[in-house]
Regions:
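Short, surface-exposed "cap/lid" segments of acyl-processing enzymes
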Residues: 3-59
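The feature captures the conserved acid-bearing segment of alpha/beta-hydrolase catalytic domains
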Residues: 13-16, 115, 125-196
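Short acidic, S/G/P-rich loop/turn micro-motifs used as interaction or catalytic elements
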Residues: 28-31, 60-61, 99, 123-126, ...
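Alpha/beta-hydrolase active-site loop
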Residues: 61-89
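Alpha/beta-hydrolase fold nucleophile elbow
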Residues: 82-98, 102
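Residue in the alpha/beta-hydrolase core beta-strand immediately N-terminal to the catalytic nucleophile
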Residues: 91-92, 115-117
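Short glycine-enriched nucleophile-adjacent loop
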Residues: 100-111, 116
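C-terminal catalytic histidine-bearing segment of alpha/beta-hydrolase fold enzymes
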Residues: 193-206
Length: 206
């Protein structure tokens, strides 16, 4: 396993001669320490000589702000990598659950990557994602929602996300996966090449 370098909130792991770069944003709460949560996945990517940058974060209600933060920190981390090894190809972005949404909301619209791998896309409302929130909102008579909302997110993807190469991975026994809705929004764009892959069993990412 390569040495882990932390640049801002990005955990960077570099082989000596990387052939490419994978930028990972994981799911809610399991991505506070992505270098641990996704250790097995990262190890396999490193074995194939990919540099891996994984963003550590604590989710909040403003997903657009977090998407912007991740994008800026990935850009900074890439600059450090290229100072060491020279120019490398555009990255492949990999998202898991909420991480898919954050990549899709990236302020560059996906233009500065070669594609996105979206594993188990999750775009539920706040009350569905946080059961305790639903109980509190009913008891205290208030409403709160993620920004952008699920409906707004799909519209933003259709109107502003420009990357045509997207691989959506759906696990057959995952009741929370919403990749079918994501694929529908992606396919509404001109020249889209997105594909959905359905797997029978959940592969451990740890």
């Amino acid at each position: 396993m390569s040495t882990i370098r932390r640049i801002s909130d990005v955990f960077c792991q570099w082989p000596s001669r990387p052939i490419g770069l994978i930028e990972i944003i994981g799911g809610s709460y399991i991505s506070i320490r992505p270098e641990v949560t996704y250790k097995r996945l990262i190890s396999r990517l490193l074995q194939r000589n990919f540099a891996v940058h994984s963003w550590g974060y604590i989710p909040n209600f403003d997903h657009q702000i977090q998407a912007n933060q991740a994008w800026k920190q990935f850009r900074l981390s890439r600059k450090f990598l290229e100072k060491r090894v020279g120019i490398i190809p555009k990255s492949i972005r990999l998202g898991h659950s909420l991480g898919c949404k954050l990549h899709l909301l990236s302020p560059d619209g996906g233009r500065n990557c070669n594609g996105l791998v979206a594993i188990s896309f999750n775009n539920f409302k706040a009350a569905q994602s946080i059961p305790m929130l639903k109980k509190m909102s009913q008891r205290l008579n208030f409403q709160t929602e993620f920004s952008p909302s699920p409906f707004e997110t799909l519209n933003l993807i259709t109107e502003h996300y420009e990357q045509i190469n997207n691989l959506l991975i759906k696990f057959k026994n995952d009741a929370l996966d919403q990749n079918n809705l994501l694929l529908k929004s992606l396919k509404e764009r001109h020249s889209d090449k997105s594909e959905l892959m359905q797997l029978m069993v959940i592969i451990s990412l740890q």
